[in-house]
Regions:
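Membrane-interface interhelical connector segments
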Residues: 40-56
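Extended, low-polarity transmembrane helix blocks
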Residues: 1-40, 57-145
């Protein structure tokens, strides 16, 4: 009798689903935090956005905060996760370069601006992964089998 293969002793489907959930939580955490910060500090967020050239910042920042929180919750719960990830991917790819303009940054802030922009591109890659492969089976709204 041959010994069981190591993967036979592991519950791979469980581990894969746990990993997908952990990835969704990780991806969503940035947006939950950012959205909550905008909503809790609306005046400061609007002033900062206005200083970056955002028109109607006082109106747009609460909407941005709500969008980020709602999308983050959808991503974590897996409820319409592909749609939330697609919306966040567009959000990232459009707003990342607008707010992290390393080419305009003073020398002492250049590296931070570059790093922030590339962090956004990494998040974009994660969102595309969710769009293409889905949230996994641990999600709300999953059809009953």
């Amino acid at each position: 009798m041959t010994p069981a293969h190591k993967s036979d002793r592991l519950n791979l489907p469980f581990m894969q689903e746990a990993a997908l959930l952990a990835a969704r939580i990780g991806l969503a955490s940035l947006f939950l935090f950012s959205g909550c910060q905008k909503l809790m500090h609306l005046q400061g967020a609007a002033e900062w956005a206005a200083s970056q050239g955002v028109p109607f910042a006082s109106l747009l920042m609460p909407l941005a905060g709500l969008f980020e929180v709602a999308s983050g919750v959808m991503l974590i719960t897996g409820w319409h996760a592909r749609q939330a990830a697609a919306a966040l991917a567009v959000w990232i790819i459009v707003l990342g370069p607008l707010f992290h303009r390393f080419w305009d940054a003073p020398p002492q802030l250049w590296q931070i601006s570059v790093d922030d922009l590339f962090h956004h591109f990494v998040m974009f890659g994660g969102m595309i992964y969710v769009v293409v492969f889905g949230p996994g089976s641990w999600r709300l709204g999953r059809p009953k089998s």
